[in-house]
């Protein structure tokens, strides 16, 4: 054992590099959820002795992690009071019919909101709003949703509180220099990059983004091609199904079929249907492919009626799938959902939510068969049919997002001014350095609970636990890199290789390397790896470390070229009906513009030479 400990001590840098490579591979291949991978990395570091047990679990009590937890809760408290909806209603009327004017207006609404609230929360609020906006103004939603995501990303860089990456970077900076970033230290650079990015979006989006998905007529049946796989079958006199309940018949388990409704003597019976006894003459509205319909006809003696006649687009509904009791709606799987990685069959989705999935949209792909065997992913868009009260229940979950506007009577509008005052006090007190943001943010949480803006039980559901576990696992990796000398080794190599370059060139290279890395890793993982290296390179070359840390922080968050580089990109991937290449088409030029502009702006605002 002593020999093993000695060997491990002698090879700390190679071992740390091996763990980094392992983490990179696991993040890219996604064999495990990234938050699980991060915790696994922390465990490996402790087992190898690269961090002590205390250091290995320190991520859970790190000031950045604690602050981010509080900011999730404060963001949720703000959204529960309907403030964003109030701002939306007061400004949306100025949108007009010009697409560029609408993009500019959306940027002005979303950007400042993202500066203080969680980005994913902003997109979750605005997704159904933008869809309805597109429908009313006869615009393809594909022209608006990537700009929505980009605007939240850019707006999140205006203040320290805008993203978890900013707060994590501040925690790393405090560890390296003894002082973290102040709340508004990002603001001069953030406002400029936001302005540059918004101008690009307004000019380029109408040209570069295709009209992939048009929901202007509201005809869900036509968009999802429901007519091709929703049919009516009737139970004839000699069918073996007569006298059995739907559960006993096992037709939904044995065949790729979902029964959406049973019609008995002209009376429509919605879900739940499992214990409904089937009788002669019953008509079943089913989701099924032709092959399965023919199989059930042969084996169970049913008859297939003529294709379901869906109503015209002018009626703005899905025909027989919708009624006064039932409806059809799209539901988005969010990043913290327990559904991710599971199949509908494993989840017993129909029984759990009292609704049936009749199609899945994944980007441009439309999945309509063998739905029970499809492993669900973050960003999948489910087309659900079920009782209207089931959707009211779905609107309260934090794992799924129903893409329709929530009624204002579900919000605590009377607490809006109180919530604004609480968040303003949190920002002012922390901004004046009276108390650390980790303290003021939790004081704000308690104030929201005491004032009734939040209920105590809502605190736990408001926290994005996947992000918290990701941070808790990544922070020990940064510690291991420092303890083992890996950060210093990287910095020495880069300083020797780039010592002859100008300050602008070095900043540009760090921005580019970080921006490319964040497209395949999470932005938090990228900042943990790159920020300490950038800091030590700056110190080695006698340059301003703050400039290098800001370049890395901004580059880590500005992920525009893929739907997987940033969570808000993934959230709009399905609803926009995008292809993977759509993000590269509009995101690559924006990345180039910011790669050239951000280092220059950093030099002008903060200087590349140390200020002493």
Curated annotation (Swiss-Prot):
Every RCK C-terminal domain range: 218-302, 316-403
Membrane topology: Multi-pass membrane protein
Keywords: Cell membrane, Membrane, Repeat, Transmembrane, Transmembrane helix, Transport
GO biological process: one example: potassium ion transport
Locations listed in the record: Cell membrane
Major subcellular site: membrane
InterPro entries referenced in this protein's UniProt entry, alphabetically: Cit_transptr-like_dom, DASS-Related_Transporters, Na/sul_symport_CS, RCK_C, RCK_C_sf
UniProt superkingdom: Bacteria
Residue ranges crossing the lipid bilayer per the database entry: 13-33, 38-58, 67-87, 107-127, 144-164, 189-209, 419-439, 459-479, 501-521, 525-545, 546-566, 586-606
GO cellular component: plasma membrane
GO MF: monoatomic cation transmembrane transporter activity
Family: Belongs to the SLC13A/DASS transporter (TC 2.A.47) family. NADC subfamily.
Protein name per the record: Uncharacterized transporter sll0640
Organism for this UniProt entry: Synechocystis sp. (strain ATCC 27184 / PCC 6803 / Kazusa)
């Amino acid at each position: 054992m002593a020999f093993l400990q000695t060997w491990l001590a002698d090879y700390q840098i190679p071992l740390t590099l091996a763990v980094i490579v392992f983490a990179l591979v696991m993040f890219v291949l996604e064999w495990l959820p990234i938050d699980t991978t991060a915790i696994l990395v922390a465990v490996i570091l402790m087992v190898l002795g690269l961090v002590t047990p205390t250091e290995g679990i320190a991520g859970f009590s790190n000031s950045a992690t604690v602050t981010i937890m509080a900011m999730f809760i404060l963001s949720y408290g703000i959204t529960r009071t309907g403030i964003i909806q109030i701002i939306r209603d007061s400004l949306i009327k100025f949108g007009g019919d010009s697409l560029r004017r609408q993009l500019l207006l959306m940027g002005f609404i979303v950007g400042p909101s993202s500066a203080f609230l969680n980005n994913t929360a902003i997109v979750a609020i605005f997704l159904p709003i933008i869809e309805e906006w597109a429908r009313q103004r006869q615009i393809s939603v594909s022209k608006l949703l990537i700009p929505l995501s980009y605007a939240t990303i850019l707006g999140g860089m205006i203040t320290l509180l805008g993203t978890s990456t900013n707060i994590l970077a501040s925690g790393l900076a405090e560890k390296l220099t003894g002082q973290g970033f102040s709340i508004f230290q990002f603001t001069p650079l953030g406002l400029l990059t936001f302005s540059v990015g918004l101008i690009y979006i307004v000019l380029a989006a109408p040209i570069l983004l295709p009209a992939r998905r048009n929901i202007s007529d509201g005809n869900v049946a036509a968009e999802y091609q429901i007519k091709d796989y929703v049919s009516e079958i009737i139970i004839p006199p000699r069918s073996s199904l007569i006298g059995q309940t739907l559960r006993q018949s096992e037709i939904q388990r044995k065949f790729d079929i979902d029964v959406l409704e049973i019609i008995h003597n002209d009376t429509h019976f919605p879900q739940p249907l499992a214990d409904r006894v089937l009788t002669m003459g019953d008509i079943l509205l089913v989701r099924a492919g032709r092959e399965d319909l023919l199989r059930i006809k042969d084996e169970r003696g049913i008859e297939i009626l003529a294709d379901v006649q869906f109503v015209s687009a002018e009626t703005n509904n899905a025909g027989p799938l919708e009624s006064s009791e039932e409806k059809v709606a799209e539901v988005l799987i969010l990043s913290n959902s327990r559904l991710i990685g599971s199949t509908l069959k494993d989840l017993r989705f129909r029984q759990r939510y009292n609704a049936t999935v009749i199609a899945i949209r994944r980007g441009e792909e439309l999945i309509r068969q063998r739905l029970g065997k499809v492993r669900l992913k973050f960003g999948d868009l489910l087309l659900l049919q079920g009782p209207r009260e089931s959707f009211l229940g779905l609107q309260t979950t934090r794992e799924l997002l129903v893409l329709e506007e929530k009624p204002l009577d579900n919000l605590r509008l009377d607490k809006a001014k109180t919530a604004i005052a609480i968040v303003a006090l949190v920002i002012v007190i922390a901004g004046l350095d009276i108390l650390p943001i980790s303290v003021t943010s939790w004081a704000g949480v308690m104030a929201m609970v005491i004032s009734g803006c939040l209920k105590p039980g809502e605190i736990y559901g408001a926290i994005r636990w996947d992000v918290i576990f990701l941070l808790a696992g990544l922070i020990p990796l940064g510690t291991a890199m420092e303890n083992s000398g890996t950060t210093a080794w990287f910095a020495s190599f880069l300083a020797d290789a780039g010592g002859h370059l100008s300050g602008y060139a070095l900043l540009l290279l760090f921005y580019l390397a970080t921006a490319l890395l964040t497209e395949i890793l999470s932005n938090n993982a990228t900042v943990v790896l790159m920020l300490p290296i950038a800091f030590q390179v700056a110190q080695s070359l006698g340059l301003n470390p703050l400039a290098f840390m800001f370049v890395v922080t901004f580059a880590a968050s500005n992920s525009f070229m893929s739907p997987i580089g940033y969570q808000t990109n993934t959230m709009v991937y399905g609803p926009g009906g995008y292809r993977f290449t759509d993000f590269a088409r509009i995101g690559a030029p924006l990345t180039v513009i910011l790669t050239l502009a951000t280092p220059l702006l950093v030099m002008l605002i903060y200087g590349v030479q140390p200020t002493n």
